[in-house]
Amino acid sequence: MALYCVGDIQGCDDAFERLLATIGFSPSRDTLYVLGDLVNRGPHSAAVLRRCITLGDSVRPLLGNHDLHLLAAAYGTRRPSRRDTLQDILLAPDRDEMLEWLRHQPLARRVHHGGGDLLMVHAGVLPQWTAEETLAYAGEVEAVLQSREFAGFLQQMYGNSPDLWSPELQGTDRLRVIVNALTRMRFCSPEGRMDFESTESASEAPPGLVPWFDAPGRRTLNTLIAFGHWSTLGWLDRADVLGLDTGCVWGGCLSAVRFGTTLADRERCHVECPQAQMPGA
């Protein structure tokens, strides 16, 4: 039995299929965690969702910002942008099945493997949060997304404020901070104030900002965190963090990591990808 994590697929189903073949993925034996952004910008978003649904419990995704955007567009709370490639889902005869499946996926996961814990999110974890708090706060959003009030939440989800976590936050403000941290954050201030403008690589941090994983005093420092979202960062393999978004949709590659008997025993697997989207297009 093998354990894998894969970065942002973003509708690139051909690359996803080739990656599964490259690693010899067996749904009866292996488990694959997808770190969010299954859809959008690539040409075959519906095929990615159908493949994941067909593979059953062997594929365990997280929600990313593009997945949440799909839900908002599908339920009429957000207009699709000209760069979106979601019509194959929105017009599909099995649209409702795909959307319902997606709506019931989590924003964070944790798995115990080889004597250690692996925490998985799409974008980042605020430095103030422990691993347990991250899962609990993600669960607050998941409960709303999976309730009858989900459409109202999707309508209020967007926005950059508040940009700083406080345990006293309530209602929409609280849920928005949680969503933004888990699905949008790249940089933050040393105090944990989130920035949503900068998309540079970690080595080009704007003044006063640091990559979220380098924030001083980060409370998840002793937990391995796997994440995607940050294509300009590319492949990152450190003792404490694994960055797996290697820009598949931009003509980079689709990357996965295979864990051996322990979390420290790991190797990268990847397939090259044709460019499906032009930056700024």
Swiss-Prot record:
Example of a GO MF term: bis(5'-nucleosyl)-tetraphosphatase (symmetrical) activity
SUPFAM superfamilies assigned: Metallo-dependent phosphatases (SSF56300)
Tree of life domain: Bacteria
Assigned keywords, A-Z: Hydrolase
E.C. number: 3.6.1.41
InterPro entries the record matches: ApaH, Calcineurin-like_PHP_ApaH, Metallo-depent_PP-like
Catalysed reactions listed for this entry: P(1),P(4)-bis(5'-adenosyl) tetraphosphate + H2O = 2 ADP + 2 H(+)
Function: Hydrolyzes diadenosine 5',5'''-P1,P4-tetraphosphate to yield ADP.
Homology family: Belongs to the Ap4A hydrolase family.
PANTHER family for this protein: CYTOCHROME C5 (PTHR40942:SF4), PTHR40942
Protein name in UniProt: Bis(5'-nucleosyl)-tetraphosphatase, symmetrical
Record organism: Acidovorax ebreus (strain TPSY) (Diaphorobacter sp. (strain TPSY))
